[in-house]
Amino acid sequence: MLSKKQLRLDMKAVANALKKRYFYFDVDHLIELESNRKKNQIETQNLQNLRNMQSKAIGKAKASGEDIKSLLKNVSDLSTKLNLAKSNLQLIQSEIDVIVLSMPNIPHHSVPNGKSEEDNIEVSKWGKLVNYDFDVKDHVDLGAMYGLDFETAVKISGARFSVMTGKIARLHRALTQFMLDRHSEVNGYTEAYVPYLVNTESLIGTGQLPKFEADLFKTYLHGEKGETKTLYLIPTGEVPVTNMMRDMIIKENDLPLKFVTHTPSFRSEAGSYGRYTRGLIRQHQFEKVELVQVVKAQDSYQALEVLTTHAEDILQALELPYRKISLCAGDLGFSATKTYDLEVWLPGQNVYCEISSCSCFEDFQARRLQLRYKNKETNKLELLHTLNGSGLAVGRTLVAVLENHQQADRSIKIPFVLQSYMGGLEVMN
């Protein structure tokens, strides 16, 4: 979340910065709430001081044998007023917290202006688009020949799920193993295995709650004594990995921290009506290899550039043409200050499709998580900066491999870097 101190000092400047991403809030109402909070806080402190003074007076009166009935009544009256003042202060603070938690992050100055994905800027392209001399199929038609089965998934779970068997299941696994090995052995990430169910605090920490609850799958665990515990299926591996460091003070010598994890991701995609949903592109359950970095404030934007190249490295190794997009302010994710999307070319559909989103959050998540380090020079605790990116979305990478490496006879050429994971197989027939 945004700094409350920053809001108090220059609320109008924050409001103007958020207008860049077409987010508006009632500045006057928040100023009024903040004014009331200050008044109630002062009143609470004054009442607390008065009660303490009266309590000390009771002690002195007792010691000298004086009547303390009037003093006891004063303390009782002050306690009643103090409890009321504390209650009012808590209500005001809760209302402020709700507003602040609903505020997105402020875009970095380098982020292009714009309202929607149509205003995003292409930064670069890699790879040549093949001019096929045969009728190109999309991954749904190709996948059906190799064990990709949507009908069985509908029988088991409903729409937007998939079943894979045989060679295509092995190719999906090979992609995952290759990504994990590349990131851990070449790019310097520590592999992490994490829970797929997380609590409310974890999702608040990384910014999915309270704003995006409709996109999450929620579970209820009923205890023997009738109590109910709520857990959510993770929408991305970023959530449990980043929360590993919640409420921690990291040693400066241990920075930067770099983690890679492979998890399923679960999303209701409540807002996807009318968007492309054919095949594996937009599923309720899909797998990703996720990259997370925790760095000092001064290092975060250089880290974003490097993290993005780690995702690009996978695409290049798999010989998949792609483009790098800088998201405009209006298209940024809620917690991000700057984001690069990598979009892979899908010849079977004649479109570029997002396959990785790499973002810097500055201290937005760290403030919620209380993720800090002790600065050796100042000897003060400072918030860290967090970043994450997909390295890559496994299902969409499978789609890209099928469509880009298809041959005229409908066989699939296996990229060289995957062949050792496929038992030496060079072509999938």
UniProtKB/Swiss-Prot annotation:
Signal peptide: none annotated. Keywords: Aminoacyl-tRNA synthetase, ATP-binding, Cytoplasm, Ligase, Nucleotide-binding, Protein biosynthesis. CDD domains: SerRS_core. Pfam families: Seryl_tRNA_N, tRNA-synt_2b. Its EC number is 6.1.1.11. It catalyses: tRNA(Ser) + L-serine + ATP = L-seryl-tRNA(Ser) + AMP + diphosphate + H(+); tRNA(Sec) + L-serine + ATP = L-seryl-tRNA(Sec) + AMP + diphosphate + H(+). L-serine binds at residues 236-238, 290, 390. One of its GO terms (cellular component) is cytoplasm. One of its GO terms (biological process) is selenocysteine biosynthetic process. The keyword Nucleotide-binding applies. Pathway: Aminoacyl-tRNA biosynthesis; selenocysteinyl-tRNA(Sec) biosynthesis; L-seryl-tRNA(Sec) from L-serine and tRNA(Sec): step 1/1. It is found in: Cytoplasm. GO terms for molecular function: ATP binding; serine-tRNA ligase activity. The keyword ATP-binding applies. Belongs to the class-II aminoacyl-tRNA synthetase family. Type-1 seryl-tRNA synthetase subfamily. Consists of two distinct domains, a catalytic core and a N-terminal extension that is involved in tRNA binding. Homodimer. The tRNA molecule binds across the dimer. Catalyzes the attachment of serine to tRNA(Ser). Is also able to aminoacylate tRNA(Sec) with serine, to form the misacylated tRNA L-seryl-tRNA(Sec), which will be further converted into selenocysteinyl-tRNA(Sec). This is Serine--tRNA ligase. It comes from Vesicomyosocius okutanii subsp. Calyptogena okutanii (strain HA).
